[in-house]
Amino acid sequence: MEQNLSKKTRTESNLIGSREVPESALYGVQTLRGIENFRISKFHLNEYPLFIQALAITKMGAAVANRELELLTEEQTDAILKACKEILEGKHHDQFPVDMIQGGAGTTTNMNANEVIANRALELMGHARGEYQYCSPNDHVNRSQSTNDAYPTAIHIGLYYTHLKLVKHFATLIEAFRKKGAEFAHIIKMGRTQLEDAVPMTLGQTFNGFASILEHELKNLDFAAQDFLTVNMGATAIGTGITAEPEYAEKCIAALRKITGLDIKLADDLIGATSDTSCMVGYSSAMRRVAVKMNKICNDLRLLASGPRCGLGEINLPAMQPGSSIMPGKVNPVIPEVMNQVSYKVIGNDLCVAMSGEAAQMELNVMEPVMAQCCFESADLLMNGFDTLRTLCIDGITANEEKCRRDVHNSIGVVTALNPVIGYKHSTKIAKEALETGKGVYELVLEHNILSKEDLDTILKPENMIKPVKLDIHPNH
C-alpha cells in the first residue's frame, strides 16, 4: 500500500537506517517501515476513524500533562494540541496507512500517530516536516509514554466511542421489534417447541420476545463497555512508570477526562493492567452473545416466513431480489441470511480475541493489534447488520393472519388448554384420536360430550390460551 507518493522526498533516519519519505507525507520513517513490513490484511488504520481520533485524544492528554510538568514548551504544546484537534475534525486520516494487524504490540500505530502529529505541529510552528529537533515524534509527542500505555489507552477510548454508536443502532433495531409486537398483538398463532406444534400464542408475543432478549444483551454490552474507561496511561513500558514523572499519570488522566467528558480512571495496578486485555475479551464476548441471539432470531424469521405455500408462512418478509437463477418466481430471505453471516463473523472474531487474550507473556500482550481490529470490525459489522435488518426486513414484515388463525384451529396443540379441566389422560386420548382421524380437537370434545360448547369456547378463547387464567369449569363426565 503506497500513500502520498511524490517525486520529492525527505530523508529520515532511525535505528535501522535512513530512508526516503515522500515529502508530501505527514508520517515518517517508522510508518514507512511499518507499511513495508506489514502487508497483511486489507484492514488499515485509516478505515477506523474513531481509533485515529482516540490516538489523537491520548496524545492531547499526554501533551497537557507534560506541559503542566514543564516538560514541553508552550509553543510545542500548542502546536501538538492544534494538530490533534485537526485529526479530531477528520483531517489527515489518510496519513494513517498502516495495517491494523502488525507485530510489535502496536508500536507502528503509535509511531504513525506520533509522526503525523509531530510533522503537522512542525508546520504550525513554521518549520519543515522532518525538522524533529523542534518537535520530535519520540521526545515531544511521545514524551512520558510508551506504546504499551498510549496504544491500549487509545484502543479503550476508541472502542468506548464505538460502543456508544453501536448501542444506538442496537436500540433502534429493538424498537422496531417492539413496534411489530404491538402491530401483531391481536394475531393468534401456534407456538412451537422442537419445531413441533406446542400451544397458542400471539405473533405479537413472538416479536416482543425477540425485543426482550435483545434488550438483555444491550444491557450486558453496556456493562462490558465500562471496563474500557479504566486505562493504564502512565504505566509506560511495563507498568513501573519509568521515564514518567510521579505526577504525570494523575495529570494525564485528569486531562483525558476533561477532553472526552468520560469517566476515565487509572488502573489500580499498572503492572497488571499493562499485560491484561480482559476488557477486549469481555466486550468481544458480549458482542458474541448478541450475535448468538441475532442468529436465533434470524433463523426464526426464516422459518416463520418459509413457503410461500409449503412452509409455515405465518409472516411475509419484504421481497428484496430474485432468489434463483434457475427457479422462476423464487424469493429468498436474503436479509436474515446476511445477518446470520454477520453473526458468524462476529463469533469467529471473538475466538480470535479469546486466543489472543490468553497469549499475553510476562508484562505485555503483543497480540493487542489483532484483538483491537477484531473488536472494531465486529462492532462495525453489527451496526451495519442491525440497520440492514431493520430497514430492509423488520420494518416491512406483514402477517398472514388468516393462515395463523387456521393453523391454531386445526392444531392438536390446543388440547393442552383442556388439561386443567379434563385431565392429562383424557386430553391425550383426544389428541391421539385427532391424529388418527384428522378431526379437530374442538369437534371431538363436543362429539364425546366432554364439555359443553359454551365451556369449550371459553377455554379456547385466544385470550385465555396466551396467559395464565383461572377457569371454574368442570367436565360433563
Explain the meaning of each model-derived region.
Residues M1-H477:
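Conserved, well-structured ligand/cofactor-binding cores
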